[in-house]
Amino acid sequence: MWQSKGPPRVAFFSWLASLGKVLTTDNLCKRCIIVLDWCYMCKRCGESVDHLLLHCPVAFELWSLVFCLFGLHWVMPHKVIELFGRHRNIDFWRLVLHCLMWCIWSAINARYFKGFERSLLEIKSFFVHTLLVWSVALSHFSCFSLSVLLDHCNFVS
């Protein structure tokens, strides 16, 4: 997890998420902070780290995009920590995991703190754009091209 080539604050966020310590509504309730216990993304279930980043219908759509890009058929793990045990040796895959979780977290914070609700298409676009920008910044690719990113996704799988 710490060997990610992504931004350090994203690696820190992923570490907190893997420990279940991100301030979701269930964790805020444990600290006696009174909030509505519902997911701000799907507006249904109680919000836990695992629900928000893995099992929420909105997160599931984003994971489906990743699986489609990589040509993967994968059973979703129950806990965030289980994500980081898979594909350990592929830096780009780790970057994808960090980027997707960061984009979900950014979308939830935009809804919660700014009242700005991104559509699913906007969140998907934000994810692909962020992944491309991070990949170029980290020298995974020499050119800024979506087609190069998509080719690399197919190569990694």
Residue ranges and their predicted role:
Residues 1-46, 155-157:
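Helix/loop segments that flank and initiate small ligand/metal-binding modules
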